[in-house]
């Protein structure tokens, strides 16, 4: 009886010793594998060229700041370029492979295939409502049209700057502009804007608040209007709301990843006279009107100089962001 108990105890002790030996062996093997892996990583890390995300980036500040690529100095290998052009350009060229041709030409300037996107827009009105400025760098080609000169200059002001916008209910409220950076931006197929300035008793100054025909007309049947009135004065507005939307906007500063190239025209569009445009923009350029092939060749040839006056941005814009933070 006692012999059986001694045997059981001895077997139990041997099992514990054997299990302990196995666990220690496994631990030594795992330690060896981990240490060797870490040693290999340490040896190879100086030879690796990989994008480093998240390190040395501040967690505060503007998301508009352009952060440099710490491991890659070649700008074009890590960036995207969007080239916006009117429908008539593709119609005139009439070549199914013209984009492939331009992509190969951009490749000679350091832009890899697939990094340049060609974006077509129908007209200024549709483009202003839904710009979709998604790329790191965005270059907009606008053919000069004397009948749309004002719309073109205002579109340039719109996309070359950032705006913080809110909806306006002109049927219920009076509105005033607080400073020079505060504007009212209207968009639509036909925008006619009338204003009636009010005194401290909310009576019209030179107009009747109950009669829109006495209001001062500041825009007539335009597709895009940036309205500027006397600061600090309440205004009652009359807008063709059936074909136009109006928003109360604040200019925040330049949108430096966008450039506008005017194509042709005897007059040069210029928004630098606006006192809120500071510093004077260099991102608005002009190409003499030629065939569209010649225009695109010129853009390819001078793309490096164009990009040099721009700054890469970390945020893309769609139509929703455009309305509330343009």
From Swiss-Prot:
An example GO CC term for this entry is: host cell endoplasmic reticulum lumen
Positions bearing carbohydrate: 69
Q: Which GO-annotated molecular functions does the record name? A: metal ion binding
Subcellular localization: Virion; Host endoplasmic reticulum lumen
Disulphide-bonded residues: 82-135, 165-249, 191-244, 196-207
The residues forming the signal peptide are 1-50
What are the UniProt keywords, alphabetically? Answer: Calcium, Capsid protein, Disulfide bond, Glycoprotein, Host endoplasmic reticulum, Host-virus interaction, Metal-binding, Outer capsid protein, Signal, T=13 icosahedral capsid protein, Virion
Q: Where is this region: GPR motif?
A: 253-255
Q: Where is this region: LVD motif?
A: 237-239
Q: Which Pfam families match?
A: VP7 (PF00434)
Q: Where is this region: CNP motif?
A: 165-167
GO BP term (any one): receptor-mediated virion attachment to host cell
Among InterPro entries, the record links this protein to: VP7, VP7_1, VP7_2
Q: Which residues bind Ca(2+) 2?
A: 177, 228-229, 231, 301
From the record, what ranges are coiled-coil? none
Modification after translation (UniProt): N-glycosylated. The N-terminus is blocked possibly by pyroglutamic acid.
Other comments?
Some rotavirus strains are neuraminidase-sensitive and require sialic acid to attach to the cell surface. Some rotavirus strains are integrin-dependent. Some rotavirus strains depend on ganglioside for their entry into the host cell. Hsp70 also seems to be involved in the entry of some strains. In group A rotaviruses, VP7 defines the G serotype.
Assembly and binders: Homotrimer; disulfide-linked. 2 Ca(2+) ions bound at each subunit interface in the trimer hold the trimer together. Interacts with the intermediate capsid protein VP6. Interacts with the outer capsid protein VP5*. Interacts with host integrin heterodimer ITGAX/ITGB2. Interacts with host integrin heterodimer ITGA5/ITGB3.
Instruction: Report what the protein is called.
Output: Outer capsid glycoprotein VP7
Origin species: Rotavirus A (strain RVA/SA11-Both/G3P5B[2])
Q: Organism classification, top ranks?
A: Viruses, Riboviria, Orthornavirae, Duplornaviricota, Resentoviricetes
């Amino acid at each position: 009886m006692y012999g059986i108990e001694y045997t059981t105890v001895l077997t139990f002790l041997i099992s514990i010793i054997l299990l302990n030996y196995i666990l220690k062996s496994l631990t030594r093997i795992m330690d060896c594998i981990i240490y060797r892996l870490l040693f290999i990583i340490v040896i190879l890390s100086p030879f690796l060229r990989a994008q480093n995300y998240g390190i040395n980036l501040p967690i505060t500040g503007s998301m508009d700041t352009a952060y440099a690529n710490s491991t890659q100095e070649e700008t074009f290998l890590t960036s995207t370029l969007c080239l916006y052009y009117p429908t008539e350009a593709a119609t005139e060229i009439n070549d199914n492979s013209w984009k492939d041709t331009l992509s190969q030409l951009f490749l000679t300037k350091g832009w890899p295939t697939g990094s340049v996107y060609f974006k077509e827009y129908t007209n200024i009105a549709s483009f202003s409502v839904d710009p979709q400025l998604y790329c790191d760098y965005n270059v907009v080609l606008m053919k000069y049209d004397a009948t749309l000169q004002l719309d073109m200059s205002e579109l340039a002001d719109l996309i070359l700057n950032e705006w913080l916008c809110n909806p306006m209910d002109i049927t219920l409220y009076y509105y005033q502009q607080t400073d020079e950076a505060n504007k009212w931006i209207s968009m639509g197929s036909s925008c006619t804007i009338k204003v009636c300035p009010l005194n401290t008793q909310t009576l019209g100054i030179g107009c009747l608040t109950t009669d829109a025909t006495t209001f001062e007309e500041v825009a007539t049947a335009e597709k895009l209007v940036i309205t500027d009135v006397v600061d600090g004065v309440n205004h009652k507005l009359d807008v063709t709301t059936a074909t136009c939307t109006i928003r109360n906007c604040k200019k925040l500063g330049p949108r430096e990843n966008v450039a506008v190239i005017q194509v042709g025209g005897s007059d040069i569009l210029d928004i630098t006279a606006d006192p809120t445009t500071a510093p004077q923009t260099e991102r608005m350029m002009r190409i003499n009107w030629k065939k569209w092939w010649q225009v695109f060749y010129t853009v390819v040839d001078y793309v490096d100089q164009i990009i040099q006056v721009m700054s890469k941005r970390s945020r893309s814009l769609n139509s929703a962001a455009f309305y509330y933070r343009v």
